[in-house]
Amino acid sequence: MAARNRRKNNKKKSLLVTSAAQEKNATYVLVAEELHKKTIDLNMGTETPLTENHENPIPAKEFKHQQKLEPIDEHDDGEDELSIKFKSMTKSSGPITEAEVQKLLLSYAFTSAAIQEDENEKESRHYPIKPPSPSASSLSAYFQSFVEKCKQVFYNFSLQTVEKLNALQNSLYEVFWIIFIYLNYWFPNVGDYVSNTFGQQDSIIIRISLSKSHFRALREKSSQKVQQAVKNIYFCFQEKPYLTAFKVSFAIGLVIPCSLLFLIMVSTATFFFFVYLTLFVVIGFFSSLFIIPLLGISFVFAIGVVSFGFCSNMSFKMAQLIYVRADAFLKKVLDKMALQTQPAQLQEPQEPLSTLRPVSNPTIPSPLRQTARPSKFVTEEDVIFEPVSAQSAIARSLETTANKAGNKFQLS
């Protein structure tokens, strides 16, 4: 009897302990499920409120049958997972064990680890290069990390270069067509001129669109070539990083001074071009204003030069003619005067030639006395010749006349 009562009391205590354990286990399971659901919703971008606790325990067999590590398939009656769990918690069944609770917690931990691993993989795709681990203390590990870092920097630089080139091409393309539109707006006759020159007015729009598409195709082709060149450089850098880095650095070091020199030359040429163009326009403008007066002045000056030259030549010819005529006339007059002159003394009987002596005649001037002596009265030893310069025809005529007059005098 006492043994029976003892068994009954033990059974009651075991039932009370079992019910308390079931309630506690159900609470743990519900909290774990709600935490798991909240984590999944947060990863998906939504957050669901926590469900309220239920007092009824979950049947152990049905919960064990439904809860697994794998995802639960949809049921035939169309009920979702949460409603099934709620129904299972409201039913009365056997107690849930601690092993099942641990399985649920392990499932939650496994799911969280999988989600974290997916996030790490996504980050590694965006940033493929990882910093070296603290354990990689050898020189080769640091060198490998340095090479990877250089590759990443060069890859980013290549992408930025291609992006800047594309932006520059787009800007130039936009500026070109804006300038064309403004020119057509400011100078409407340009469109008519182009249409009359290259075709009908209806086809000018088609021609502009064709040129625009052609320019776009050239721009795309050039951008593709640039991208292909950058890719080739990147692949060469992966294969031979030192040689490629040396070539790129040498090319950059050569391109920079060449670009500066080219820029200076272009700037200087452009400056002088505008200076010469301005001077040409100014000189052309003023010459067009004063072309008629300048031509008139030059014509008058040419007429004056020709007139003065003609008058000078004529005056020289007239003076020469007058001088020659006067010289001839004076010569004739002197000849006549010499013929009409009579001797002032009578002739005496002549002495022999051997006894004759040259006697000076004071009536004859001294120059003529020295030169005008008849050769039959004097000898060669007694004749004294002095240089007499005949500067003109008048002097020569005077000398001739004096010679003729001297021959008629009898020198004693």
UniProtKB/Swiss-Prot annotation:
Entry GO CC: cell periphery; endoplasmic reticulum membrane; lipid droplet
Membrane topology: Multi-pass membrane protein
GO molecular function list: protein-containing complex binding
Annotated region described as Disordered, given as residue ranges: 347-374
Gene Ontology BP annotations: lipid droplet organization
Induction: Levels gradually but drastically drop as cells approach stationary phase (at protein level).
One Pfam match: Promethin
Chain ranges on the Cytoplasmic side, renumbered to this chain: 1-170, 269-271, 315-412
Record's keyword terms, sorted: Endoplasmic reticulum, Lipid droplet, Membrane, Transmembrane, Transmembrane helix
Transmembrane in keyword set: yes
Subcellular location field: Endoplasmic reticulum membrane; Lipid droplet
Role description: Involved in lipid droplet (LD) organization. Modulates triglyceride (TAG) storage by reducing DGA1 LD localization. Promotes LD targeting of some proteins, including PDR16.
Record's protein name: Lipid droplet organization protein LDO45
Organism for this UniProt entry: Saccharomyces cerevisiae (strain ATCC 204508 / S288c)
